[in-house]
């Protein structure tokens, strides 16, 4: 297998799908050497099959807004790979959603889910619309219209969606309510991220952020460092950033900045519990403005319009917002501001040249598919609880999450340790996930 040849073919076939092509290239470059040591993979054309989704559903979403006007959006569900389990991946409600974005996310999800060691395949979906600016009634009607089409291609043993950007507990509730009515059955295993009183898992909202900090803590311990006292900067203020801030503070780190589309909120003395709680209020407001934090806590926070968290002096950077949010220029600014560790919490949050800069300039770097796997891992634990008709305590879920993140870190170290003793976490994560999926595909035949 030659990465250059496969990429040339994909670029000719999908010329405008930048995110998808970027994700595929990163994985293929990491696994090429190992792949070529397995002629059985080449004979079965594993890579050529793995880079194409099993299927993509595209459908119209028609709903009525509060003014009585009919609105039309496009919805998608990309079922990428089910070699190791039923399709599993979130629903992203965002106006920038495209097939390319969802293919990239579904491809990444395939390897992320494999890293958890839980039996879950990869998928992703969503519409080209988001909750911002919509009333609660409009969000409910939109979710119902979306599920009116989606329900035909999901199921507890087939495809289990969850939340993602723009989809939290409220949206999952509306989606499940419509699914229940259409399917005429009460089967909570069809969605994860549900409310704790009706089949959801305790700690699911915090899980991605918590898991990211457990992985970061493992990385630092491996490097002979301690997270206590470290200054941390975070991008975003949604569920992922909230969970990351909460766990970072609990572990003794000091979160000194969070950011939004409007700018950065500096918190010199570190974020407090009250401020972390207020992040949920900010997200629920649908204003999408981090300046609200500075207005609510004027003595503790300072807002700077148009700036990013990367402009603040720190030890550790946690991109928690969106794909490709951290550029080469941002990476250089972080390094100049004292940053020596960057762990992606968003999916593909760093651009390729930013990752290259980190890896060649003394900055520890770990990729999103490993760092943020705690979210889907806890979704997997929710699936287990639903299937077994049991409910675990928060402590039990947290212990299982911590164990899974420890195992993911160990897999990255196993496959990513270089001859000079350094650890390439990108290569380690990609090879570990790839080998599990590739082996399953090989053993299941040419399908």
Whereabouts are the PLM-identified features?
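N-terminal cap/recognition module
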Residues: 69-110
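Glycine-rich phosphate/diphosphate-binding loop of Rossmann-like nucleotide-binding domains
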Residues: 195, 200-313
């Amino acid at each position: 297998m030659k990465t250059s040849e496969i990429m040339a073919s994909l670029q000719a076939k999908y010329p405008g799908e930048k995110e998808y092509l970027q994700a595929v290239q990163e994985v293929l470059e990491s696994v090429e050497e190992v792949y070529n040591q397995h002629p059985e993979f080449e004979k079965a054309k594993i890579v050529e099959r793995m880079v194409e989704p099993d299927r993509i559903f595209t459908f119209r979403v028609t709903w009525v807004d509060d003014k009585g006007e009919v609105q039309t959006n496009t919805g998608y569900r990309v079922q990428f790979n089910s070699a190791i389990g039923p399709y599993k991946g979130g629903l992203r409600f965002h106006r920038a959603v495209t097939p390319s974005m969802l293919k990239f996310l579904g491809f990444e999800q395939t390897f992320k889910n494999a890293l958890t060691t839980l039996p879950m395949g990869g998928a992703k979906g969503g519409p080209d619309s988001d909750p911002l600016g919509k009333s609660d009634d409009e969000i409910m009607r939109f979710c119902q219209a979306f599920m009116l089409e989606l329900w035909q291609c999901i199921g507890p043993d087939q495809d289990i969606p969850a939340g993602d950007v723009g989809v939290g507990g409220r949206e999952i509730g509306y989606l499940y309510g419509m699914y229940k009515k259409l399917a005429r059955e009460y089967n909570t295993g069809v969605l994860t991220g549900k409310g704790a009183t009706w089949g959801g898992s305790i700690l699911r909202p915090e899980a991605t952020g918590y898991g990211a900090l457990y992985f970061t803590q493992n990385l630092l311990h491996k490097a002979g460092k301690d997270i206590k006292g470290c200054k941390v900067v975070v991008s975003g203020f949604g569920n992922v950033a909230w969970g990351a801030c909460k766990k970072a503070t609990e572990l003794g780190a000091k979160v000194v900045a969070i950011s939004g589309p409007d700018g950065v909120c500096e918190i010199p003395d570190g974020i407090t519990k009250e401020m972390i709680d207020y992040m949920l209020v900010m997200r629920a407001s649908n204003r999408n403005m981090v300046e609200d934090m500075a207005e609510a806590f004027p003595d503790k926070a300072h807002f700077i319009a148009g700036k990013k968290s990367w402009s603040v002096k720190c030890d550790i950077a946690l991109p928690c917002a969106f794909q490709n949010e951290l550029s080469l220029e941002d990476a250089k600014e972080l390094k100049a501001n004292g940053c020596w560790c960057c762990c992606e919490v968003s999916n593909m949050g760093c651009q390729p040249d930013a990752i290259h800069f980190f890896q060649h300039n003394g900055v520890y770097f770990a990729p999103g598919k490993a760092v943020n796997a705690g979210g889907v891992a806890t979704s997997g634990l929710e699936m287990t609880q639903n299937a077994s008709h049991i409910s675990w305590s928060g402590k039990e879920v947290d212990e299982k999450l911590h164990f899974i993140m420890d195992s993911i870190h160990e897999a990255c170290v196993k496959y990513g340790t270089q001859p000079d003793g350094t650890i390439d976490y990108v290569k380690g994560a990609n090879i570990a996930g790839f080998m599990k999926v590739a082996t399953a595909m090989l053993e299941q035949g040419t399908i």
